[in-house]
Amino acid sequence: MFESKINPLWQSFILAVQEEVKPALGCTEPISLALAAAAAAAELDGTVERIDAWVSPNLMKNGMGVTVPGTGMVGLPIAAALGALGGDAKAGLEVLKDASAKAVADAKAMLAAGHVAVMLQEPCNDILFSRAKVYSGDSWACVTIVGDHTNIVRIETDKGVVFTQADNAQEEEKTSPLGVLSHTSLEEILAFVNAVPFDAIRFILDAARLNGALSQEGLRGSWGLHIGSTLAKQCDRGLLAKDLSTAILIRTSAASDARMGGATLPAMSNSGSGNQGITATVPVMVVAEHVGADDECLARALMLSHLSAIYIHHQLPRLSALCAATTAAMGAAAGMAWLIDGRYDTIAMAISSMIGDVSGMICDGASNSCAMKVSTSASAAWKAVLMALDDTAVTGNEGIVAHNVEQSISNLCSLACRSMQQTDKQIIEIMASKAH
């Protein structure tokens, strides 16, 4: 069944997952600004005394209400300050992993002194944009990130331009392993998952380790909205059944609780989002445990889940008005369906039902309430799988769902790319009015 050699398409699939599935400490939008600030601070010899920062509306939306790990505070200013004073510019999405208690205290003092300003970049044509300008005496350094959470495109200091990506940006775009996703299909992804050597995808088990640890932490502590631990108590009280469906709900939401509540544990992210990584991982883990799957089966199911989620999200803007926990849960539906019966038709039906169910869920910024949407998406995924196992699904006669799952995905993504742009603007306006 399994092939010993890896063909170029499969190698591209593996590279795509390795590029998009990475550890991340803290919500990735404020972390992107923290990285910009850390990279800017690394260009200075003295201590950072002041920070000015500019972000895109979408990054502002996803950074306003989320807790920065280790600080107990929400928002972009504390992320920028801690990045500059305690961040590791070489650590990417884990920029804050080694921030000391002193760095946290100094960052809070900088905020209290009014030395951190975070503003909207206007005009801004980039969905994901963050720029941090840090000052030390008469010296300054400025770092700009565009397009991806860790994609530094320009470094400049008072002495001149240190780095600019403009010259080689087009070449990097050509060589990105994600390019193959524009010319593949779910059937090819499934064929890859079924036949690729286990050793080539063993690395995906790290997602289970990291996101499983977050889930356990969410059940132990009182993080965020503590949805997972609350529902676990309701099970003990007899108000919620102790079954597989509930286990998926509780353990997935608990991981998101810990993630959004500021736990100092990394998530294995997907497509630049910790919550998407959690959603693509934990439901699959729970079902794998239920059916007694070994590590190899778990790895194949996780690879199907994560790669399917990346495949769908690749057709979306990096940030949009569409809650991407829903698309990550479509990947989870594929992984769970594969564990139960492995048929392509079951996987396709489950994804189609997901599109007919949760496709209208909006993203109103990163916050503790993301765990609600993660839990809803995970539950919908399992419901869609249960229907598909009995050959029942939302069909092409209903709504935006088409008779072909690939067209259904395209229909969903076209909504986010076009029609939901105005929705996104309205969400940002509402959130901005609350901040005043």
From Swiss-Prot:
GO biological process, one term: L-cysteine catabolic process to pyruvate
MF annotations from Gene Ontology: L-cysteine desulfhydrase activity
Pfam families: SDH_alpha
Family per record: Belongs to the UPF0597 family.
UniProt-recorded name of the protein: UPF0597 protein YhaM
Organism of origin: Salmonella typhi
Taxonomic lineage from the root: Bacteria, Pseudomonadati, Pseudomonadota, Gammaproteobacteria, Enterobacterales
Gene of this entry: yhaM
